Design a protein with these regions (language model features):
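Chalcogenol-based redox active-site neighborhoods
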Residues: 1-157
Length: 157
């Protein structure tokens, strides 16, 4: 599958979310949506990323944006992650990996000489019309949430 690019329509999704219920991209039409994909709840980089987005949530909201984190973890895992770290972002559970695949972030990775399938840490900014307005792949966590916020503010202006 071709990688998503700026200007492409963002694939819609409906996923079970932390706290019960579901989260759907289409339910936020008219708003900017930050969709960030991360490998695993409560691991070092993923925790820093989630807490960074959480600390900036008021600024994202005042710019008219919502934040959705997605990983292949279970809802139960998400609930524990949210409770442990006081997260304010929505977390979608993609155990089937259909959304991960639709966004092209479920990829072959390698560590210590072994290859395996996993999530490539990536973020997509979806505009009010449902089109991709920003793409960050192979994200390095330090400063990432701030960079995404600046992009949101630039689009909101």
């Amino acid at each position: 599958m071709a990688e998503l690019s700026i200007g492409d329509m963002a694939p819609d999704f409906t996923l079970p979310r932390d706290g019960g219920g579901t989260v759907s991209l289409s339910s936020f039409k008219g708003k900017q949506v930050v969709v960030y994909f991360y490998p695993k709840d409560d691991t070092s980089g993923c925790t820093v990323e989630a807490t960074s987005f959480t600390s900036l949530t008021p600024e994202f909201e005042s710019s008219g944006a919502v934040i959705i984190g997605i990983s292949p973890d279970t809802v139960k895992s998400h609930d524990k992650f949210v409770a442990k770290h006081g997260l304010a972002v929505m977390l979608g559970s993609d155990e089937e990996k259909t959304t991960l695949e639709a966004y092209g972030v479920w990829k072959e990775k390698s560590m210590y000489g072994k290859t395996y399938m996993g999530v490539e840490r990536s973020t997509f900014l979806v505009d009010a019309d449902g089109r991709i307005a920003g793409v960050w792949r192979k994200v390095k966590v330090p400063g990432h949430a701030e960079a995404v916020l600046q992009a949101v503010k630039g689009k909101a202006a």
